[in-house]
Every structure is written in C-alpha cells, then in structure tokens.
C-alpha cells in the first residue's frame, strides 16, 4: 500500500469580487456551510472563505479569495473549466434544477454524460458549476480492470448538434421546491474539469507522475472535436476525479485567472510524511515544488502541471475545528497566530460579513 497516495480532491479555490454576495449565494442558494472566515495568508488584506459540508471534510471544500479589483477571468488552456458537485440521483438533480430556476438562476441540462447526468449554472461571478449524479459509473461500457485503456465514443444522440435540446430544457421537477432538503444536500464534489493543450501529455502527468488511475477516454460531448479524459484516485469514486478537455496546441487561447475563475485546486493526502514523499517524487520527475507551507487547517505544497495549472497537495488535517467550536464554524473571522498582532488592521481592511 502506498501511504503517500493521493486519495482524492481536497479543495478548489476560486476568485470572487464580493465576499458577502458569495456567502449569500453559496449558503443560501447552494446550501453549503461557511466553515471558515479567514484571510489569504499570502495576501492578508483579502478574505479567504471556505465552504463545505457540515463536517468541513476534504473533498467538500470550495474556497474563495475576495479580490474586488481582479479582472474578469475566462476559461482557456491552463485554467479550470468547471467544478462539479455530487447529487445522489436524477430525481434529486431535477429538484436542484427546479430550486435554482425558481431562484432566478439559469440552468442548462440535464445532459446524459453516459457515466453520470449533469446540469450546469454559474455563480454571481461566472464560475461554472455542475451538479452531477453519482452514477451509473465508469463500468457501464468497460470492465473494471480495463478502465481508461481505449477510446469510448458516446452515443451520437448525447452529443451537441444531435441531442434534443428542447426536450432536455423541459426536464425539471414537477412541483416547486421550497427549500434545499436533506436529500439534496451537496456533501462532496464529484469532479474538477480543466482545459489542456495536449491530452496525452496531461494523462502521462496525472497517471504516471501523480499516480492517479486512468478511468475513461471519451470525447467532449459538447465539442466532439476534442477528447475528454478522466483520472481518479482509488476506484475513481466521485470526489476523487479530475478530467480535462484536450485541444490542439495553439487552437485555444490561454485562460485568465480572475473573478469567476479557479485559482488552483488541491489533492488530498494523509499527512506531512506523504507530502515529503511527494516533494521527492516531484523533484525526481523534474517538477519544482514549494516547501511545506502551514495553512493552519492543513499543510500544503504547490507545483504546476504541464499547462501551468497551479496544483496543491494538502493534508487531510488538522482540520477546521482547530481554532473554532465545530458547531460554530465560519461564524467569526479567524487568523493564524502569526497574524493575530495585526488583527485590528486586517479587520479594518475587510468588509464585515453577515452570515446566516
């Protein structure tokens, strides 16, 4: 057993322009819990907000830097395209669609992705969010021991230009959804998808350098000229999956990190011993990585993939209850010990938040 192995997604960090608007959207419209109010440790004048499930578990965490003056980000090579959260079934997904549209949020789908079913929408800054069903899973068209070895084109009727868009748009829950109930609660991410300039080079990096398991080789259902490749940790369960659309070099512009765009995403490991092992493995592969950095709630190292995506390997602990009662996470501004002496000045630069 590889004790340093990546076990799944830890978190994804994006950029927002307005912390209060972001809190209102993710807690009020998506039912996530604000599990930590702190600051960007590398830029203490900016909020760093963490949203997740009630336990603030790795794999549930979506975080934001508040940069009000940031340019509008856009997707492209070197940036994330979207982040997906998991819902149990098509029925709970239909309820999500009815809830979101009932709250004035434009939703596309549900789309049949063969391995799961998807709806899409955007947050107030334009971050693309997907809610994907748990199944049916990767083995609907491949044996478990042969995943990701051969190209699996999707049924043509599921692809852009061939599917019945009007019928898809009409699918929703038949009754109004007055609130996000327990069955709808988003407990973890499903996957993260980014854009790559060379799909096979990217597969080599994630599968060989990072040791993730190839899960699927298919095509982008919305742009059948581009491949869509998937890797995961362990058995490839939701919450462990990273995917990318591949494009020919020069055929797509580079993305721009800004508001409405991902800054980086983090993969989960057990502890600092695993991080030290990853520093050695990355160095042996010629991939520069940072020293281990103390992020208070976890430890981190940072590096980049071949297209320049900022990646992080983060530890599962010590967790978000280290400085706050677990029943009151996210209710007040928390600073690490090395910033406490500057609390008054830091708080004075931050716009107060209304939570709950």
Residue ranges and their predicted role:
Residues 8-9, 175-221, 226-228, 235, ...:
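Surface-exposed interaction/gating patches
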Residues 65, 80, 146-150, 244-246, ...:
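Short intrinsically disordered coil segments
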């Amino acid at each position: 057993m590889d004790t340093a192995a990546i076990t799944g997604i830890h978190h994804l960090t994006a950029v927002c322009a307005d912390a209060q608007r972001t809190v209102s959207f993710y807690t009020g419209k998506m039912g996530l819990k604000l599990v930590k109010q702190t600051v960007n440790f590398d830029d203490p004048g900016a909020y760093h907000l963490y949203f997740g499930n009630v336990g603030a578990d790795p794999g549930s965490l979506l975080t934001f830097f508040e940069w009000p003056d940031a340019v509008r980000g856009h997707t492209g090579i070197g940036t994330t395209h979207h982040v997906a959260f998991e819902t149990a079934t098509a029925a709970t997904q239909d309820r999500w669609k009815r809830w979101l549209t009932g709250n004035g949020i434009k939703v596309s789908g549900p789309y049949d992705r063969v391995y799961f079913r998807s709806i899409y929408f955007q947050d107030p800054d334009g971050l693309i969010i997907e809610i994907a069903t748990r199944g049916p899973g990767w083995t609907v068209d491949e044996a478990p021991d042969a995943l990701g070895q051969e190209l699996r084109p999707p049924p043509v009727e599921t692809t852009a230009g061939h599917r019945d868009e009007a019928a898809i748009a009409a699918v929703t829950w038949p009754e109004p959804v007055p609130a996000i109930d327990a069955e709808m609660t988003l407990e973890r991410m499903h996957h993260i998808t980014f854009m790559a300039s060379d799909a096979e080079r990217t597969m080599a990096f994630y599968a060989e350098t990072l040791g993730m398991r190839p899960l699927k080789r298919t095509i982008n259902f919305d742009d059948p000229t581009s491949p869509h490749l998937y890797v995961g940790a362990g058995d490839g369960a939701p919450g462990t999956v990273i995917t990318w659309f591949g494009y020919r070099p020069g055929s797509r512009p580079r993305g721009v990190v800004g508001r409405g765009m991902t800054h980086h995403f983090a993969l989960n490991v057990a502890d600092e011993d695993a991080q030290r092992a990853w520093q050695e493995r990355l160095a042996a592969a010629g991939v520069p990585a940072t020293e281990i950095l103390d992020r208070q709630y976890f430890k981190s190292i940072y590096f980049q993939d071949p297209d320049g995506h900022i990646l992080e390997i983060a530890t599962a602990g010590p967790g978000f209850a280290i400085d706050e009662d677990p029943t009151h996470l996210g209710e007040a501004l928390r600073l690490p010990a090395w910033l406490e002496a500057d609390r008054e000045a830091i708080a004075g630069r931050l716009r107060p938040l209304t939570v709950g």
